[in-house]
C-alpha cells in the first residue's frame, strides 16, 4: 500500500527536526510513497526530493487529500490543532523532538517554560498519534497522554562518508592541531549542549585541543571561559558550517557533553564515521548505546569527563562497536520500517 503523506515544519533550516523529516521523505519516496513538505518561513538550507510549499498559518492545506499529516514542532502542531477538519480522513501524527519543559527551561524562565510547554501539550489533543524519539521520552510524555496515544521511533542519519571540507579549512585545523589529540564538537552553542565542561576539562588534558563547529548564544560566554581558564590557545571556534559532519574525519574524539537531548543525531553521524565518542550519561544516551560503544561520563563531573576522554583515546574498538550498533538499530531501513508500522496501524 502506497500513501500520500504531508509533512509540516516551521522552515527549511538545518536543524534536527527538519533533518529527521528529510530522512523520512527520502525513505518514504524510495518506497514509492508520495510526499509533500509544507513550511511557514523563508529559508532553503535543507532540500527535499519532493514538492515543497510555503504556506501561511491561516490557510488550510487539503487535509483530506492525504493519508497522513505529520507535523514537527510547536507551530506545525498548533496549525494542525486549528485547521484539522472535524471529519478528517487523514491520520494526524506529531513527532515530539525534545523533553518539552526541560528543553524550554534552557531558553526561558521556569514559569514561561511550564506555561508554554503545557499549552503545547494541550494543543496535541487533536492528533491521532504522538511519536517520541525514545522509550525514555515516551515515559516522560505519559504525564500528559495515554499510553495508547504514545509510541516511539528512533531517528536515523544517512550521510555521505566522502564529503570533504575545503582546503583552507583543513589547513587551518591541521595547523591548530599539530601533534595534539583533537576533541571535536558539532553543536549549537547553548548552555544545554554542555560545551563549557569540555573547556573546564582541558585544564587537565595538556596534550588535547578542542575544535567547536557551531554558532549560538553561548559562544561569547564559552570564549570568555576559555580565556579565564587560560586554555584559549587550545580551543578553536570554527563558527557555523553546513553539513558539520564533514569535519568528523579530523577528530580523534567526538564529544557529546549535553545536559539534555531529544535524541542526538550527531551521535549517529559519528557512528557512521566510526568515531570514538565521549558522551554524558543522560538517559537518552544510556538508552541508545552502552559502555562498549561509547565512553560515558557523569554530567557536571569534570574528573569523570577527563577520565572518559583519556579512556576513549586508548580504546580503539569504540568506533567499530558504535557503527555496528548504528547498523543494528538506527539504520535508514530500521527507521523506515518503524515509521511505516506507525503510519499503517494508527
Q: Could you say what each language-model-derived stretch is?
A:
Residues 316-344:
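A charged, aromatic-enriched C-terminal amphipathic alpha-helix characteristic of glycosyltransferases
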Residues 112-130:
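Membrane-proximal helix-turn-helix segments that form the acceptor-binding/catalytic region
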Residues 71-77, 96-99:
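Short His-centered aromatic/hydrophobic patch
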Residues 276-279:
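Short hydrophobic beta-strand element within catalytic cores of glycosyltransferases
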Residues 240, 259:
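Aromatic "clamp/platform" in nucleotide-sugar-dependent glycosyltransferases that forms part
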Residues 125-149, 157-161:
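A short, active-site helix/loop in glycosyltransferases that binds the activated sugar's phosphate group
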Residues 18-23, 181-204, 217-223:
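A conserved mid-protein helix/loop that constitutes part of the nucleotide-sugar donor-binding site
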Residues 291-302, 310-316:
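Conserved acidic donor-binding segment of nucleotide-sugar-dependent glycosyltransferases
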Amino acid at each position: 500500500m502506497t500513501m500520500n503523506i504531508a509533512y509540516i515544519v516551521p522552515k527549511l533550516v538545518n536543524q534536527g527536526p527538519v533533518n529527521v523529516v528529510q530522512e523520512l521523505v527520502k525513505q518514504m519516496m524510495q518506497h514509492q510513497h508520495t510526499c509533500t513538505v509544507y513550511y511557514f518561513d523563508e529559508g532553503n538550507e535543507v532540500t527535499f526530493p519532493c514538492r515543497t510549499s510555503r504556506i501561511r498559518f491561516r490557510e488550510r492545506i487539503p487535509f483530506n487529500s492525504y493519508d497522513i499529516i505529520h507535523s514537527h514542532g510547536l507551530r506545525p502542531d498548533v496549525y494542525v490543532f486549528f485547521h484539522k477538519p472535524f471529519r478528517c480522513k487523514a491520520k494526524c501524527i506529531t513527532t515530539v523532538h525534545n523533553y518539552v519543559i526541560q528543553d524550554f527551561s534552557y531558553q526561558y524562565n521556569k514559569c514561561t517554560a511550564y506555561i508554554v510547554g503545557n499549552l503545547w501539550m494541550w494543543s496535541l489533543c487533536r492528533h491521532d498519534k504522538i511519536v517520541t524519539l525514545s522509550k525514555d521520552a515516551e515515559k516522560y510524555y505519559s504525564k500528559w497522554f495515554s499510553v495508547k496515544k504514545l509510541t516511539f521511533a528512533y531517528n536515523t542519519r544517512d550521510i555521505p562518508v566522502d564529503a570533504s571540507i575545503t582546503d583552507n579549512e583543513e589547513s587551518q585545523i591541521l595547523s591548530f592541531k599539530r601533534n595534539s589529540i583533537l576533541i571535536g564538537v558539532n553543536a549549537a552553542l547553548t548552555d544545554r549542549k554542555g560545551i563549557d565542561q569540555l573547556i573546564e576539562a582541558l585544564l587537565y588534558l595538556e596534550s588535547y585541543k578542542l575544535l567547536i563547529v557551531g554558532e549560538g548564544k553561548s559562544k561569547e560566554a564559552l570564549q570568555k571561559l576559555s580565556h579565564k581558564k587560560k586554555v584559549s590557545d587550545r580551543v578553536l571556534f570554527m563558527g557555523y558550517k553546513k553539513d558539520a559532519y564533514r569535519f568528523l574525519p579530523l577528530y580523534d574524539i567526538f564529544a557529546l557533553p549535553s545536559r539534555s537531548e531529544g535524541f542526538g543525531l550527531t551521535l549517529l553521524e559519528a557512528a557512521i564515521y566510526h568515531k570514538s565518542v565521549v558522551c554524558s550519561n543522560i538517559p537518552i544516551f544510556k538508552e541508545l548505546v552502552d559502555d562498549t560503544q561509547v565512553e560515558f561520563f557523569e554530567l557536571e563531573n569534570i574528573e569523570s569527563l577527563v577520565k572518559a576522554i583519556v579512556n576513549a583515546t586508548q580504546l580503539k574498538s569504540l568506533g567499530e562497536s558504535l557503527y555496528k550498533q548504528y547498523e543494528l538499530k538506527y539504520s535508514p531501513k530500521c527507521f523506515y520500517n518503524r515509521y511505516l508500522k506507525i503510519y499503517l496501524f494508527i
